[in-house]
Amino acid sequence: MQVLPPSSTGGPSRLFIMRPVATTLLMVAILLAGIIGYRALPVSALPEVDYPTIQVVTLYPGASPDVMTSAVTAPLERQFGQMSGLKQMSSQSSGGASVITLQFQLTLPLNVAEQEVQAAINAATNLLPSDLPNPPVYSKVNPADPPIMTLAVTSTAMPMTQVEDMVETRVAQKISQISGVGLVTLSGGQRPAVRVKLNAQAIAALGLTSETVRTAITGANVNSAKGSLDGPSRAVTLSANDQMQSAEEYRQLIIAYQNGAPIRLGDVATVEQGAENSWLGAWANKEQAIVMNVQRQPGANIISTADSIRQMLPQLTESLPKSVKVTVLSDRTTNIRASVDDTQFELMMAIALVVMIIYLFLRNIPATIIPGVAVPLSLIGTFAVMVFLDFSINNLTLMALTIATGFVVDDAIVVIENISRYIEKGEKPLAAALKGAGEIGFTIISLTFSLIAVLIPLLFMGDIVGRLFREFAITLAVAILISAVVSLTLTPMMCARMLSQESLRKQNRFSRASEKMFDRIIAAYGRGLAKVLNHPWLTLSVALSTLLLSVLLWVFIPKGFFPVQDNGIIQGTLQAPQSSSFANMAQRQRQVADVILQDPAVQSLTSFVGVDGTNPSLNSARLQINLKPLDERDDRVQKVIARLQTAVDKVPGVDLFLQPTQDLTIDTQVSRTQYQFTLQATSLDALSTWVPQLMEKLQQLPQLSDVSSDWQDKGLVAYVNVDRDSASRLGISMADVDNALYNAFGQRLISTIYTQANQYRVVLEHNTENTPGLAALDTIRLTSSDGGVVPLSSIAKIEQRFAPLSINHLDQFPVTTISFNVPDNYSLGHAVQAIMDTEKTLNLPVDITTQFGSTLAFQSALGSTVWLIVAAVVAMYIVLGILYESFIHPITILSTLPTAGVGALLALMIAGSELDVIAIIGIILLIGIVKKNAIMMIDFALAAEREQGMSPRDAIYQACLLRFRPILMTTLAALLGALPLMLSTGVGAELRRPLGIGMVGGLIVSQVLTLFTTPVIYLLFDRLALWTKSRFARHEEEA
């Protein structure tokens, strides 16, 4: 029977040691809560950090970019600009389309933003053109966010117009109703319509004009209320044949009489079933298709949204004819799941490595089981808190748990090692557990709260970067806190029941060999430490050198923002000469598609040509290249992009810009390259002067590649210069001229055909097959005030000019975006600095302002990094100062930090990695890790001075030897916890590797140096404290 120690021993652990059943059940409750939480947690690529974003699209077929800007975009922008919480407003006005993107503050709920947008649209309605075919339509989506899923719909037996009609009605609408879906777009533009192609010569010969035809069609096809009859006994609803449904009915429409004979529409026009917009087209691989892109709402969970679509697809495709084939070409969640699976595997690997290192040091199965239980218990228990905080299982939270593997075992190791030491001295397990746990309790609290203090500044980071790492910091802090609780409750209780002198003394051949090895290492360390203490100034110079070296490395290391991920999808923009037509662009696109599909890494390709709100001009095309899974291709995405661009360079007359899709999207515009830089002015003239000059300079910079601009001001324009005096004499107004031109060349939507399921348009235009180009303008006829027909050429001259193909605004002012990539041998920091230097040399006028796009977040993150690290150090100093009731000891502990910085930065440079936000988080974590060596040394040195009356030198020397094994064990555990991240090669490895590299490098260097520098600095500050006390005492005596 064991004699129980006094109730004063054991500290907070005593209750749990003495009540094993209650302690066990408490831990089981934590375990069950964590398991339930894990099953309830959603899965995503990254924490949800999207800005609330809404896109407003207005289509006005036939309108020029200038008309779209002044008549549609500007009135809407004025209303939107008055909304509270608006962070940024950008717009793009192109031929027939206006797209306004509204990005709100992170704190504004999306539903509130939606209400404000709807109110603003309502307020602007009276200012918009009266003949606008449809009112502005808004969607809760970020247009720069790549689709979560892309589907291609093809058919070998049906025309594309019928295919799109069925897909829009039976598939797209249903998918739009799924929770989390923000927008479903159908690219390909094959919406059914009745197209009326007027024969200009025929109507001119009959003395008619296109306006006569338009008036006749709109008057003949109506769908309005007619009333009802209510008699004494019966009620009758009135109806009529006021609707025409088919092209054949329109052919028979009488548009005028001449000499008593009817003139039917079919006599002067070709009337056929066709597409609403003939200048739109989409292809899947080499086959014409309807391409369906599904985008999520900002903040929606991508995995659950995609799962819902997958579940609904079989049911939707069953409603389509068998000749219609629906193919899922890309699904971003495939790579997200693979990335999360790889991270989970690395987490399990980290746990296995940590348990292995524990056994290597403790050489005892019962002693290994105890921390082996503490690690998974701490990690699994964290899931319960994550559910409560609405977190998700994503790459960052799993990275936090992987790193936590090395952290959470530290507490258990320190407790076990201390209790084992007393058992080996002959004390009973229960007494040793009470004594050891009570003695080490303060150290555990110091380790825990000082490490959590390092994470506090991460919670106060602003904007999107702060939101991004909040889940990481809190997840890690919760795991560390649960670990501390487990180490002060379950660990000493298990030590009291599972450890004994016999089990600790029982050794096999491996145990004896490893014991001798550790004894030799400790002896060698003791000899080295004695020499270092005899030459303190040399050691201090090494410590100062690491501080200076860390500053130099910080200055010179390449800096980036966020690792470029390989998600298996490449977005592309194909650019042709600005005067390119739709037919010309479609042909070039097919040539490029043939080249791309020959690459062995490419699985499928979708492409789109035309202007419909997603593409700005006819001379550009959008491409989405879907790569094979990572394990089925030899190269990562950057090498594939380089290879594709080299191959496409052989296609004449086109430029191809490619960039890999990323899980983190900050910009609101689809860009040609990875990074953007904007020039904003008060007028388009200022941009036309300075953009070419800046582009010329930037294209010469070696720090940039793929430099391009969306400034296109060489679009061909046929300017109709009307002689107003001549027109007025003939009774012809400018409205008559505009109407005649719009009727002929605007694919004008003049009437609507209503059916039970959908609505279709009647499109009016001139048949220009026999009069191509500017010659078609000679066929335009106008009606004078006396009823005569007047050629347009008699009152107007046609001038060929140049004008912008699209007009972009940022916060209501003209803007152009310069896109660029960064070559492999340079960093984003180099590129940003080179752009800023170039900007200074040009001496831009004051009315031109510049701003970075996604790189603005990089500048903001980089600017706050130093303060973030300073805040972490200050937070730790405050916590340690409170815990030790000392101003000096925290400085001794913090003196270990420069060594970690040197190791991390050197490792990143050797590995060729940039110092990005992921690596910076690793350095901040190192601040919390490496100080534990000093804490364990100083705690025992102070206890030896206080309880055994040792001198500071003897106390710190003994503390270093006594704590060498747990220090080495905990450092190796943390290192092995980060090792799987450093060696990661699977999907999403680009995101995880910088964290692992920085931590492994920092831990190795700090472990080697702090074992020697910390004792010397401890003695230095001890002498400084004695000298300060003596000075104060002398002053008091003199006083």
UniProtKB/Swiss-Prot annotation:
Annotated compartments: Cell inner membrane
Subunit description: Part of a tripartite efflux system composed of MdtA, MdtB and MdtC. MdtB forms a heteromultimer with MdtC.
Family of this protein: Belongs to the resistance-nodulation-cell division (RND) (TC 2.A.6) family. MdtB subfamily.
Gene giving rise to this polypeptide: mdtB
InterPro entries linked: AcrB_DN_DC_subdom (IPR027463), Acrflvin-R (IPR001036), Multidrug-R_MdtB (IPR022831)
Species the sequence originates in: Shigella flexneri
GO molecular function: xenobiotic transmembrane transporter activity
The keyword Transmembrane helix appears for this protein: yes
Main location class: membrane
Lineage of origin: Bacteria, Pseudomonadati, Pseudomonadota, Gammaproteobacteria, Enterobacterales
The protein's name: Multidrug resistance protein MdtB
Top-level lineage group: Bacteria
HAMAP family with a match to the protein in the record: MdtB (MF_01423)
Pfam families documented for this protein: ACR_tran
Signal sequence segment: none
Protein topology in the membrane: Multi-pass membrane protein
Residues that span the membrane, as ranges: 15-37, 345-362, 367-389, 396-418, 438-460, 472-494, 535-557, 866-888, 908-930, 967-989, 999-1021
Keywords: Cell inner membrane, Cell membrane, Membrane, Transmembrane, Transmembrane helix, Transport
GO cellular component entries: plasma membrane
SUPFAM superfamilies in the record: Multidrug efflux transporter AcrB pore domain, PN1, PN2, PC1 and PC2 subdomains, Multidrug efflux transporter AcrB TolC docking domain, DN and DC subdomains, Multidrug efflux transporter AcrB transmembrane domain
